[in-house]
Amino acid sequence: MASKTLRVLFLGPKGTYSHQAALQQFQSTSDVEYLPAASIPQCFNQLENDTSIDYSVVPLENSTNGQVVFSYDLLRDRMIKKALSLPAPADTNRITPDIEVIAEQYVPITHCLISPIQLPNGIASLGNFEEVIIHSHPQVWGQVECYLRSMAEKFPQVTFIRLDCSSTSESVNQCIRSSTADCDNILHLAIASETAAQLHKAYIIEHSINDKLGNTTRFLVLKRRENAGDNEVEDTGLLRVNLLTFTTRQDDPGSLVDVLNILKIHSLNMCSINSRPFHLDEHDRNWRYLFFIEYYTEKNTPKNKEKFYEDISDKSKQWCLWGTFPRNERYYHK
């Protein structure tokens, strides 16, 4: 019997770093269809509502710029929505969402300065134009700020303009389209990956323009919780990452410390903590926060998970375990 084709969503278009993360995750799977999504919300929504989709790959954080807040907020919103759907009073304060995290991927971010046309003198050719319009994803600007500042100082006679795009790969496509419509004294460039330049048959002016070496983006691999098939996760180590979100009883002094202290009591090492504001509805008070923590457990080490969960339930207002998954070996790469 022929094996089922896996259908995997990623933040498109093709040639993005999200595409690379999806390829890394399923590189050992022979029959995979990679489907570009137009936005991070689509990566969530389509996975939840289209049963033909098996997995979705979304960016979570960058080692230079920090959180990808769209992804954090989409996780937050799903927990809150699920909590509001529970009957009152609910039997438990543990929330079980419709999707779960089953793996992580890390993709080195190596940006290139890309041109739709061949420039005979390379970067020096920029001085021949009155205006240079640079296209890229908003997340990129903070990763190449020093490079762009240096370029502007090198060509003070040139006006540099930045234009946001939905993805790095789309920025190459957009600069190609724009260059055919503008006059000769305007040059359109893009900042994207070498893969994106090759995909769109564009020219790389300069490689590795990142301000910091080792810049990396972390991605989560999601699936529907009722999808009980093979997770397609390559398990190479003993260390597990657990992603848990919770809210506190805001007016109780020390309520956040009480939750975090449970990790110490159970000898669990927390490796990450973040927070996002939330509202239950338009009448809800401001300045309430949902917390994201990640902590380690080991594959073959017995832990009293149920007692840990009981303690979390006792000290938090509501909580959700999004998944337990292997620590990817790329996490340790510099």
From Swiss-Prot:
Catayzes the decarboxylation/dehydration of prephenate to phenylpyruvate. It catalyses: prephenate + H(+) = 3-phenylpyruvate + CO2 + H2O. Residues 244-322 form the ACT domain. The keyword Amino-acid biosynthesis applies. Its EC number is 4.2.1.51. GO terms for biological process: L-phenylalanine biosynthetic process. Pathway: Amino-acid biosynthesis; L-phenylalanine biosynthesis; phenylpyruvate from prephenate: step 1/1. This is Probable prephenate dehydratase. The gene is PHA2. Induction: By L-phenylalanine. Keywords: Amino-acid biosynthesis, Aromatic amino acid biosynthesis, Cytoplasm, Lyase, Phenylalanine biosynthesis. GO terms for molecular function: prephenate dehydratase activity. It comes from the Eukaryota.
